[in-house]
């Protein structure tokens, strides 16, 4: 198409140039003709006759006719030249008339001067010749003009054809351009529609991904809740069975127990009772039921002869207040099958005697009546510290039972089976009383049964009870254990479990030195895994903390590598969130009551933001008209301690966490203003609150701030906490090793990399040096 247009334009240009050249030639010819006419008129010859005038007029007419050129400029020039020729012809005629008049006058007035006829004839002949030549010139000019007119007609027809062709080509070009523009618009509309459809599909894809993620999280949460409910039901069933058996035993033991339960102060070696601050929720309901039975049933002489009496009840009144029971109910959260209560029931219940019970019952043949006589004699002895020794000697007394009592083939109504049922009930009560002794007795005074009860119920580690039974016989031995002894003697392969035991032992050692147990001892692993992680917005790590039995003491010793290696916390921000949550607990001296009181006061007011939970931060975000972005903070790890104690977490970081697009400057500026109004004055307020409710930010706590070193076990304590500036650098992911130098324990696992070496190192070994008898 473009080539055709170019060729057409070249042809049109050539035709126009040829026409211009022909017009130029015509002008030259007309100029020559005019010059010849001027020469003829200037030569003095006779003027042109009528024929010449007619021919000139005809020539003028033909010239005027020939001037009909499409090019108006050429026509105008031709017309001017024709009119000029007509004027010249008219002048010639006038000159001819004047000459004729002069001739007549000269013939009439001057006869003497009259020329001869011969001369006149000669002049006339000359004039006729000149006129003939002028006629010939005019005829030639006519012929030339006719020829030019024909050529002009041909040229006009060619120009018309060219114009028609050019118009058709232009029409085709216009149609092509119109179609091209239409197709281009259609293509642009199609591209825009595709872009909109792509954006819609992208939004739908991300919406589906978000819904799938939410559905997965919801399903996981529902599954975990279902598992927790199932485990809770199992725990409740186990506690119910244990309570029924304990109540049945207590119903029969009430007369003798009532006679032995004497009010008064509990005295150990003449000193006041050593009280531990932690309440055990497991024994609250049992001790309350026991107290009710003591004061409601009168003694019966027949029961006094038929029921065995445990010496542990003589000097340990089981009185518990309603507040303690309520606190126990609050702190008993659902847990898995490895919870301390379920383990207590599984070890204390007599339906399936395990290796521990087999070790406790040696095949020594002795009648049940002799055992009763022995107990009646021991009742008459003086009650004092020796009675506590007899409490832990019950394991030796139970060894006198016949192993045949555990045979399932015996009749349920036989005397042997009844005696077995009584022994199981007393064993359960003995275990509960031993747990009670853990609360009221220094660790150095513990016996083997108390150590086992502490390890199983308080520390929630029944998997190590068998090795503890074989190797640890008293609390003094437990205080002298090193990390190597814990690993090889008790089979504690997990470094976090070893750390938990070491921190607890050191806490009890400090308590014996004159200080009370740390407030961190009140924070069990159930509260840490369920309540605390949910408060800081990281409930997705609850199962890992639950599996590793992370309690309050463990929290105060966690390091970044512990979070990464053992607890699967790989995100830097989540690590900093956990560490800042621990820093907040440290500031309130690990007091749940102080923390809950401060959170209750700021629930409806935007004050004291350092103690805000993740849910309280979500509520604040909704209150400042950003509720469409509030759900993005769920399970994000953003809580009050991060907003106040982390200097690098500014308004930009908060906007990024909320998912506010970077182009929405008004929303980001609004968020920055709200944050500056709430969180900037929070530092001074947090210091005042810390001074009011707990340990000031600069003071060390009693668990990991003692500045000690235990050379025998490799346990090291470092005084002071890591400065928050270093945590801030770690939050910005610029310092990969932040918080690595913070902690209180060495991070050593037994064979974490090599499974074979782990099996060899975790093999249980017995040590004769650890088998220390009760003193």
Curated annotation (Swiss-Prot):
InterPro entries for this protein: Kazrin, Kazrin_SAM_rpt_1, Kazrin_SAM_rpt_2, Kazrin_SAM_rpt_3, SAM, SAM/pointed_sf
Low complexity composition bias: residue spans: 51-64
SMART domains, per database record: SAM
GO annotation (BP), single: keratinization
Expressed in which tissues: Isoform 2, isoform 3 and isoform 4 are expressed in several cell lines including keratinocytes and bladder and epidermoid carcinoma (at protein level). Isoform 2, isoform 3 and isoform 4 are expressed in hair follicle and interfollicular epidermis (at protein level).
Disulphide-bridged cysteine pairs: none
Regions annotated as coiled coil: 74-256
SUPFAM superfamilies: SAM/Pointed domain
Nucleotidyltransferase as UniProt keyword: no
Pfam families (UniProt xref): SAM_1 (PF00536), SAM_2 (PF07647)
Region (Disordered): 38-66, 290-427, 688-715, 729-762
Segments forming domain SAM: 446-511, 524-588, 612-679
Residue span of region Interaction with PPL: 174-333
Keyword Translocase: no
Biased composition (Polar residues): 411-422
Compositionally skewed regions (Basic and acidic residues) per UniProt: 732-742
Localisation per UniProt entry: Cytoplasm, Cytoskeleton
Positions where Phosphoserine occurs in the chain: 352, 367, 387
Keyword tags: Cell junction, Coiled coil, Cytoplasm, Cytoskeleton, Keratinization, Nucleus, Phosphoprotein, Repeat
One GO CC annotation: cornified envelope
Physiological role: Component of the cornified envelope of keratinocytes. May be involved in the interplay between adherens junctions and desmosomes. The function in the nucleus is not known.
Subunit architecture: Isoform 2, isoform 3 and isoform 4 interact with PPL N-terminus.
Family membership: Belongs to the kazrin family.
UniProt-recorded name of the protein: Kazrin
Organism: Homo sapiens
Name of the gene this protein is made from: KAZN
């Amino acid at each position: 198409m473009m080539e055709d247009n170019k060729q057409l334009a070249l042809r049109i240009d050539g035709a126009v140039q040829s026409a211009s050249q022909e017009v130029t030639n015509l002008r030259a010819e007309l100029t020559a003709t005019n010059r010849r006419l001027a020469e003829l008129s200037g030569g003095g010859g006779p003027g042109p006759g009528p024929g010449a005038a007619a021919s000139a007029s005809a020539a003028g007419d033909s010239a005027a006719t020939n001037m009909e050129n499409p090019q108006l400029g050429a026509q105008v020039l031709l017309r001017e030249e024709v009119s000029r020729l007509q004027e010249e012809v008219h002048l010639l005629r006038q000159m001819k008339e004047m000459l004729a008049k002069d001739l007549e006058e000269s013939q009439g007035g001057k006869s003497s001067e009259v020329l001869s006829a011969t001369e006149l004839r000669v002049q006339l002949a000359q004039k006729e010749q000149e006129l003939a030549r002028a006629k010939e010139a005019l005829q030639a000019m006519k012929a030339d003009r006719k020829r030019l007119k024909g050529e002009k007609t041909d040229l006009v027809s060619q120009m018309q054809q060219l114009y028609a062709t050019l118009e058709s080509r232009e029409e085709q070009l216009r149609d092509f351009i119109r179609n091209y523009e239409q197709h281009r618009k259609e293509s642009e509309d199609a591209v825009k529609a595709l872009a909109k459809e792509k954006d819609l599909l992208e939004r739908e894809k991300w919406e589906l991904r978000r819904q799938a993620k939410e559905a997965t999280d919801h399903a996981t949460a529902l599954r975990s809740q279902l598992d927790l409910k199932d485990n809770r039901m199992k725990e409740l069933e186990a506690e119910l069975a244990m309570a029924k058996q304990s109540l049945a035993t207590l119903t029969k033991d009430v007369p003798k127990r009532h006679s032995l339960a004497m009010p008064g102060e509990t005295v150990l070696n003449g000193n006041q009772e050593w009280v531990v601050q932690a309440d055990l929720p497991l024994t609250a309901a049992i001790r309350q039921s026991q107290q009710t039975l003591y004061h409601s049933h009168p003694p019966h002489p027949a029961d006094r002869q038929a029921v065995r009496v445990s010496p542990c009840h003589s000097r340990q009144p089981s009185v518990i207040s309603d507040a303690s029971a309520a606190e126990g109910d609050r702190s008993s959260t659902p847990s898995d099958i490895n919870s301390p209560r379920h383990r207590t029931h599984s070890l204390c219940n007599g339906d399936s005697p395990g290796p521990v019970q087999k070790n406790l019952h040696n095949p020594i043949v002795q009648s049940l009546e002799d055992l009763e006589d022995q107990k009646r004699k021991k009742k008459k002895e003086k009650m004092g510290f020796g009675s506590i020794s007899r409490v832990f000697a019950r394991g030796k007394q139970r060894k006198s039972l016949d192993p045949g009592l555990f045979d399932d083939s015996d009749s349920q109504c036989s005397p042997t089976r009844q005696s077995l049922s009584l022994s199981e009930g007393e064993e359960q009560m003995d275990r509960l009383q031993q747990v009670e002794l853990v609360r009221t007795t220094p660790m150095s005074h513990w016996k083997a049964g108390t150590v086992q009860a502490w390890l199983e119920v308080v520390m929630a580690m029944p998997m190590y009870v068998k090795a503890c039974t074989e190797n640890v016989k008293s609390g003094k031995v437990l205080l002298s254990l090193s990390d190597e002894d814990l690993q090889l003697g008790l089979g504690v392969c997990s470094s976090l479990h070893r750390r938990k035991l070491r921190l607890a032992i050191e806490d009890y050692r400090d308590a014996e030195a004159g200080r009370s147990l740390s407030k961190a001892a009140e924070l069990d692993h159930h509260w840490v895994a369920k309540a605390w992680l949910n408060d800081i917005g990281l409930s997705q790590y609850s199962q890992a903390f639950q599996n590793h039995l992370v309690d309050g003491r463990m929290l105060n010793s966690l390091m970044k590598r512990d979070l990464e290696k053992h607890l699967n916390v790989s995100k830097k921000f989540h690590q900093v969130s956990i560490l800042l949550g621990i820093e907040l607990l440290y500031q309130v001296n690990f007091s749940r009551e102080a923390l809950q009181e401060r959170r209750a006061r700021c629930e409806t007011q935007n004050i004291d933001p350092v103690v805000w939970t993740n849910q309280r931060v979500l509520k604040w975000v909704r209150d400042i008209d950003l509720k469409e972005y509030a759900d993005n903070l769920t399970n994000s790890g953003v809580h009050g301690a991060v907003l106040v104690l982390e200097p690098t977490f500014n308004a930009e970081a908060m906007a990024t966490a909320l998912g506010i697009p970077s182009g929405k400057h008004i929303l980001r500026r609004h968020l920055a203003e709200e944050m500056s109004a709430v969180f900037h004055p929070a530092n001074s307020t947090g210091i005042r609150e810390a001074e009011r409710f707990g340990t000031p930010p600069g003071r060390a706590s009693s668990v990991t701030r003692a500045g000690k070193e235990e050379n025998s076990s490799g346990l090291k304590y470092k005084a002071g906490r890591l400065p928050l500036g270093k945590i801030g650098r770690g939050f910005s992911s610029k310092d990969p090793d932040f918080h690595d130098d913070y902690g209180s324990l060495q991070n050593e696992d037994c064979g974490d990399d090599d499974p074979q070496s782990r099996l060899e190192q975790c093999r249980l070994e017995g040590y004769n040096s650890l088998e220390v008898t009760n003193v």
